[in-house]
C-alpha cells in the first residue's frame, strides 16, 4: 500500500485529538480575532514558478474567511473519519484506506475558494435563528463536500492531460503504486461526497436541493470537460483553429469554470442557509459570468507570464506556456486568431499544440507582437470597472458583499 510521502500539516493532522465539541458554538458566536491565531493549511504553489503572491493565503484580507478556513481545519478529522464508518470498511479496508490517502493528498491543499465562501457566507445569507451550532457545523461539512468535488475534477484533469505535478508535488496518479487505479479513487471520492450528505444532512430542510445542486454540478462540469476536448482530435492531435473563437471560449468558461466555481458555490451557500431560490440566482448570471470569465482568463495569463514583473530562472521558464503545448483554447489563443495577420496566423497554426519549447516560444513571440499582454490588462480593468458598476445594482436580497468577496478572490481588490 502506498504511503504518503507528504502527510497533512500539523494544523490538521493533530486536530483529531484536539477537536473541541464547542467549535460550532465558537464560530457562531465568537469574534473573528478569537479564531485566527492557529494557522490553517497553507496551500502549496502549483510549481516553483508560481508567483509569490499565490503562496500567501488569499484570505489574509478577510478576518471572517480566516475564521472559516480555521474552522474547516478543525472539523476535517471528523468529516474524513466518516470513511471508517462505511459498513464495508473492514471487508475492503485497503480500498477505503487508499480513498482516505487520496483525499488527504489532494483536497486540503487547494485555495478552498468554495469551502471557505460557503462557511463564511452561510452566516451572511441565513436568518439569525437558523445560525445554530449544528448548522454552522453543517456549513463546514458542505464546504468539504464542495472541496472534494473540486479535487475530483482536478484529478480527472490531471489524468486526461497527463500532468506530472499539481501544486508543487506529483499528481496523485503519477505516484508509485497508483497509476490508473486513480480512476477508481476519483469515483470513490464522488460517491463519498454523497455519503457525507446522507449522513449529515437528512434533517436539513434543503437536503433535496443540496443533493440536486451537487448532482447538477457534476453533470455540467463534465460537459465542460468534454467540450474542452472537442477542439483537438484525440488521435491525430490536429487542432481545429476555426473553433478558437470568443463565443466558444465563453461557452468553455461557462461550463468548466463559472458553473462549478461561482454559480454552484452561491447555490450551495443559499441552500445551506435555507434561502435557495434558483430564479434569484439566474438573475445574477451576468455578474457571475463576468467574474468567472476573468478568473479563467487570469489562469490563462499566469500560464504564460505569471506575475507582472516577476523574474524567472531559465529552468522555470520551461514550465510556462503549457496551454500552448497542449493545444488548449485560451483567452490568448482566441484573441490572437481574431486580430492576427496571415503570417502570424500561419506561425500559430504551425506551432500551437506541439511539445517543443521552440514551438511554444514561436507562438509567444506572436502574442508579443500583438501586445496581448497589454490587451489582457485592458480587458481585466474593463471587467473590474463593469463589476464595480453592476454589483451595486443587485437588488434581489442577496447581499452585495457576496459578490464583492468573489470579485476580491479574482482581482485581489474590492469593487467598492
Swiss-Prot record:
Binding residues annotated for Mg(2+) 1, in chain numbering: 157, 161
Keyword Magnesium: yes
Tissue-specificity statement: Specifically expressed in the anterior midgut of male beetles, the site of aggregation pheromone biosynthesis.
Cofactor notes: Binds 2 Mg(2+) ions per subunit.
Cofactor names: Mg(2+)
Any one of the GO CC terms: cytoplasm
Keywords of the record: Isoprene biosynthesis, Magnesium, Metal-binding, Transferase
Domain of life according to the entry: Eukaryota
Protein name (Swiss-Prot/TrEMBL): Geranyl diphosphate synthase
Organism: Ips pini (Pine engraver beetle)
Amino acid at each position: 500500500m502506498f504511503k504518503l510521502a507528504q502527510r497533512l500539516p500539523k494544523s490538521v493532522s493533530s486536530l483529531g485529538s484536539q477537536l473541541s465539541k464547542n467549535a460550532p458554538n465558537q464560530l457562531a458566536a465568537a469574534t473573528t480575532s478569537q479564531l485566527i491565531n492557529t494557522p490553517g493549511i497553507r496551500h502549496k504553489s502549483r510549481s516553483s514558478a508560481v508567483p509569490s503572491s499565490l503562496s500567501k493565503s488569499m484570505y489574509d484580507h478577510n478576518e471572517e474567511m480566516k475564521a472559516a478556513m480555521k474552522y474547516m481545519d478543525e472539523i476535517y478529522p471528523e468529516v474524513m473519519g466518516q470513511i471508517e464508518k462505511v459498513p464495508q470498511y473492514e471487508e475492503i479496508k485497503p480500498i477505503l484506506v487508499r480513498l482516505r490517502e487520496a483525499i488527504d493528498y489532494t483536497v486540503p491543499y487547494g485555495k478552498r475558494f468554495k469551502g471557505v465562501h460557503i462557511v463564511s457566507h452561510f452566516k451572511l445569507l441565513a436568518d439569525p435563528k437558523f445560525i445554530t451550532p449544528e448548522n454552522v457545523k453543517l456549513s463546514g461539512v458542505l464546504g468539504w463536500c464542495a472541496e472534494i468535488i473540486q479535487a475530483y475534477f482536478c484529478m480527472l484533469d490531471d489524468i486526461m492531460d497527463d500532468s506530472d505535478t499539481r501544486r508543487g508535488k506529483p499528481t496523485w496518479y503519477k505516484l508509485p503504486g497508483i497509476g490508473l487505479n486513480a480512476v477508481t479513487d476519483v469515483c470513490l471520492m464522488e460517491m463519498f461526497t454523497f455519503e457525507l450528505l446522507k449522513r449529515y444532512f437528512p434533517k436539513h430542510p434543503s437536503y433535496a436541493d443540496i443533493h440536486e445542486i451537487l448532482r447538477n454540478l457534476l453533470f455540467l462540469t463534465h460537459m465542460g470537460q468534454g467540450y474542452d476536448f472537442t477542439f483537438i482530435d484525440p488521435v491525430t492531435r490536429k487542432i481545429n483553429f476555426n473553433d478558437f473563437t470568443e463565443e466558444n471560449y465563453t461557452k468553455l468558461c461557462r461550463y468548466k469554470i463559472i458553473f462549478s466555481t461561482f454559480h454552484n458555490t452561491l447555490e450551495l451557500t443559499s441552500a445551506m442557509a435555507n434561502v435557495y431560490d434558483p430564479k434569484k440566482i439566474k438573475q445574477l448570471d451576468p455578474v457571475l459570468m463576468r467574474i468567472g470569465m476573468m478568473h479563467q482568463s487570469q489562469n490563462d495569463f499566469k500560464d504564460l507570464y505569471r506575475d507582472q514583473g516577476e523574474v524567472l530562472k531559465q529552468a522555470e521558464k520551461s514550465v510556462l506556456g503549457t496551454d500552448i503545448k497542449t493545444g488548449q483554447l485560451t483567452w490568448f489563443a482566441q484573441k490572437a486568431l481574431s486580430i492576427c495577420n496571415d503570417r502570424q496566423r500561419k506561425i500559430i497554426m504551425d506551432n500551437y499544440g506541439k511539445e517543443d519549447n521552440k514551438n511554444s516560444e514561436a507562438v509567444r513571440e506572436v502574442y508579443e507582437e500583438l501586445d496581448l499582454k497589454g490587451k489582457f490588462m485592458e480587458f481585466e480593468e474593463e471587467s473590474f470597472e463593469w463589476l464595480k458598476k453592476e454589483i451595486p445594482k443587485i437588488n434581489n436580497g442577496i447581499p452585495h458583499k457576496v459578490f464583492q468577496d468573489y470579485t476580491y478572490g479574482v482581482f485581489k481588490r474590492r469593487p467598492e
